[in-house]
A protein has these predicted regions:
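Active-site beta3 strand of CheY-like receiver
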Residues: 45-52, 56
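C-terminal output helix
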Residues: 85, 101, 105-114
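Helix-turn-helix DNA-binding segment
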Residues: 135-173
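Basic, Lys/Arg-enriched C-terminal extension of HTH/homeodomain DNA-binding domains
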Residues: 180-203
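Conserved acidic segment of CheY-like receiver
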Residues: 2-15, 19-23, 36, 50
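Acidic catalytic/metal-coordinating carboxylates
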Residues: 34-35, 60-63
Length: 203
């Protein structure tokens, strides 16, 4: 995985250049944008975080955050603002922002927020990869295997072959055969692991 990037969006050129220069000196990879629209036009779901000015023309910070949430862009956001108040900061945090920093702020505070955001982004992406891998395993199942798997997930304390067979109108021997195939295809060894895998898919 490539190094994470700080995506900096601020309509004031002096703020962009000052912050970009300071962050690069601290070893961060930085991409700067003068507007939310410019960022959206160029962003390719790269990992990192977004340092976002609250009060911008055209699309402001909260509007961009809302748009990203609607379109499932999970890049963590750190708001910076020279005139945002408590209501705005509360709204941003409720919508998932990492933090809301009032200008002027200490560079050390921003750096700490960036590290937190990078950690959150990594966790989110790893969870998405695990979910996709789990879904791919379930896609290996036939319709009958999926039916039996669903029964076992919904009735983890009642997975005897006779009970499953009675519920699905098939023989216990057929249940045993399908159960073995289910565990093999899902790369698991027990009903407990089946339930855990299903929880990953549904997360």
């Amino acid at each position: 995985m490539d190094s994470p990037t700080v995506f900096l969006v601020d309509d004031e050129e002096d703020v962009r250049s000052t912050l970009s220069r300071a962050l690069k000196k601290r070893g961060f990879q930085v991409q700067s944008f003068e507007s939310a629209r410019a960022f959206l036009d160029q962003y390719q779901d790269d990992h990192g975080c977004l340092v976002l000015d609250y009060g911008m023309p055209d699309i402001n910070g909260l509007e961009l955050q809302s748009l990203m949430n609607e379109t499932k862009l999970t890049l963590p956001i750190i708001f910076i603002s020279g005139h945002g108040g408590i209501p705005e900061s509360v709204q941003a945090m409720k919508a998932g922002a990492v933090d809301f920093l009032e200008k002027p702020f200490r560079q050390g505070d921003l750096v700490a927020c960036i590290q937190t955001a990078f950690d959150r982004d990594l966790e989110t992406r790893e969870a998405a990869l695990a979910q996709n891998a789990a879904k791919a395993r379930f896609d290996r199942l036939t319709s009958r295997e999926r039916e039996i798997a669903v029964f076992m997930m919904e009735n983890p304390s009642n997975t005897a072959s006779k009970e499953i067979g009675r519920a699905l109108d098939i023989s216990p021997r057929t249940v045993d055969h399908h159960r073995a195939r289910i565990l093999e295809k899902l790369e698991i060894g027990s009903v407990i692991e089946l339930v855990e895998l299903s929880q990953i898919v549904r997360a």
